[in-house]
Amino acid sequence: MPFDPLLFAQNTVILPEIIVIVCLLIVLVLDLIQENSAWLSTISLTGLVAATIALVFQWNHPSANDFLGSIQVDNFTISFRGIITISSALSILISTEYIKRAGMGLAECLIFILTATVGGLFLCGANNLVTVFVSLECLSLSSYLLVGYAKKDVRSNEASMKYLLMGGASSSIIAYGFSWLYGLSGGEIELSKLVDGITNHIDEPIAVWVALACVVVGIGFKLSAFPFHQWTPDVYEGSPTPVVAFFSVGSKAAALALATRMLSIVFPSIESEWHVLLELLALLSMIFGNLIAATQTSMKRMLAYSSISQAGYLIIGIVCGNIYGYTGMITYMVTYIFMNLGAFGCVILFGLRTGTDQIRDYTGLYLKDPLLAFCLSVCLLSLAGIPPLAGFFGKLYLFWCGWKSGLYLLVYVALITSVISMYYYLRVVKSMFTRETKEQSSYVRNYLAPSLSLLPTTSIEVGIALCVFISTTLGFVINPIISATSETLLATNTIVG
């Protein structure tokens, strides 16, 4: 029988993960042969693009299990795995220039990002407690190393230690919750088989509630949802900016997939209870994330608190508990990739040219670098939900799904806090476009403006251009994307009846 690559991609459940692992090994070996080779980034990007293509081939095919049922593949998991590979590829695009100029080892950073990507990919489809925990730790350990990657920077070392201690505590809590689930189910580890144990012990609510609370706390930490967000501002501020960009999307996507599958599959008998818990997390995250973001003076800290509020918006999709809520969550997550990574790319580029990330230092940027000011403005306005940018349509559909599901309080709070977010996003845009020379910051006054060119010349400029283009145009094709996603999720998804 002749080899059919399409059939191979469809029937190999973990083909995308295999591609990324092979790519990781090639980067490792190549760096041993030729340190900081120019091919390292190209190989990493090629592997991630190939993994994304493999996911496209798997899309809309019957659900499949592999490795004795430890990995589940359906359109829901494929969607989130695609989000992770795309966000990793964009993170590498916008980080390569930064790493080279900072004099840090490129191979190590790429290896950590690819390892975290593998952990995130497996976590999205993990179908038993062991696979979930191992995948989560693969993602977490790589993240700790990425945070402390700039080892000569005291702030990076401090951030790494904080993240390690708090991450270790959250892993311990979720492992404790898993031990309760294992005991309640009579020794089962597969997610679908844990349900009977929970149902049989519904008359012992304390045991079930302890297990649920531990799972929610562990996932809340990864989502950086309030009040489990304490690590986020300090880690975001102390970490290298490209690392922060990767965290803001990649780990959040993996945590969302895990939260949706764990809660929907394992705890259907107490659905109303965990809905209340998640509604509370969403409300607190949206309110406090936006209020505190409005007081920040650092761009990285502002985007950190903004990501907390974004987690609150995304949780609305989980609480909906239906195909439309999941579609809204995935749609908004796709728009979030490009507008958030685009904003971080602009912050990285400005930091490389000025050495600062303070909001006041962006004053008057338009006069020196109109293209960078325009790109950052587009991404921030999209994050704020200003039409006709992609962020507006993503938020609109997600909030509509929440309204149709009867989550009126959540939607009202989401709308009010979205208005609050406009204040701190527009504040940056306003300061960049001030025309008074005397109001320019000293950093902008001494800014070495590049020659004006519409064609990107470096990898970071390519990444920013791609994010800005998609953030601008995605809204015009959002309806076909929503329709296709909802139809295929309804046809093949295993977490929705």
UniProtKB/Swiss-Prot annotation:
It comes from the Eukaryota. It is found in: Plastid, Chloroplast thylakoid membrane. It is an enzyme of class 7 (translocase). Keywords: Chloroplast, Membrane, NAD, NADP, Plastid, Plastoquinone, Quinone, Thylakoid, Translocase, Transmembrane, Transmembrane helix, Transport. NDH shuttles electrons from NAD(P)H:plastoquinone, via FMN and iron-sulfur (Fe-S) centers, to quinones in the photosynthetic chain and possibly in a chloroplast respiratory chain. The immediate electron acceptor for the enzyme in this species is believed to be plastoquinone. Couples the redox reaction to proton translocation, and thus conserves the redox energy in a proton gradient. Belongs to the complex I subunit 2 family. This is NAD(P)H-quinone oxidoreductase subunit 2, chloroplastic. The gene is ndhB.
